[in-house]
Amino acid sequence: MSGVRVLVGTKKGAFILTADGARDAWSVDGPHFGGWEIYHLKGSPADPNRIYASQSSGWFGQVVQRSDDGGKHWEAVGNEFAYVGGPETHQWYDGTPRPWEFTRVWHLEPSLADPEVVYAGVQDAALFRSDDGGEHWNELAGLRAHRTGSAWQPGAGGLCLHTILLDPTGGEKIFTAISSAGVFGSDDGGAHFAPKNVGLSSEYLPDPDAEIGHCVHRIAQHPARPEVLYMQKHWDVMRSDDGGEHWHEVSGNLPSDFGFCIDVNANDPETIYVVPITSDSLHYPPEGRLRVWRSRTAGDEWEELGRGLPDKDCYVDVLRDAMAVDQLDPCGIYFGTTGGQVYGSPDGGDTWQAIVRDLPAVLSVEVQSLA
């Protein structure tokens, strides 16, 4: 029977949750790297035994870890992330220039075809690539070199490149999302990038419809329809039907259009999921009721999903990297909370169960579907 491996990054280590295809009984392994913040860990689509992890500490800095046996053993790999070329500064919160400084790896995105190739999104925002399993990293400097680079400003969590979408057709398109500069896309494998923010509007900007400056929390894509992109912005849920060239709002009847995560059902490119959060100052679900909302119409209409989720007194957050889907049918949906719970649904969101409780605050959730 097929199986599922859920990779959970938390503020105090990584945990690996496994189940067979029924997804009704789970084993929990961890913590790996106990005491360290694990911003993200993700498995290679080309080799399920290859997993990359971003290990970070305010005291000891950044370490990239690699496993070749499904997370049983780990090896520290290359950890030098050197910016090349300009610009020399970006804008700070108050608008003053500030030198670019590497802090941590926010997101790791393995190649869809080659387990040795992996991309890293970092803070301060830049995109790096390794062709040797993470041993050496080279900046794809065309992103920061865009004429707007010196005007990028951080969001509340810093100036971070937190999302990387690789071309599911095998081509050279790359989409990245930066808080808070916006979405940038490349058609040539990362040599050059252009903003993809037309249609976004942010009231906190001097020009709400500016080319850059939008606090994009997450973007998602389905491989069967790569021209359609979905976005959870600081406020607003958005959709693009033309590869990010234009966006329009699809928040509809959601109880709040603020949130962090968004994902797409593996078996239906028009079925998407979000977790509404009350506001940018109240980081918990509306009325303390933890709910996932699902749209089967690409965002035109939404329905509340709560069977098995807390109905009251729930004041947790679900962060941008903390939701993922498996590739089984029916599709499994998984998310983690800042309260340390990881919830899973084996039936596309109709019902939920707590896979594990009382972990440290969950920073990221990724899923591997195993043969």
Per-segment meaning from a language model:
Residues M1-A371:
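Extracellular glycan-interacting surfaces
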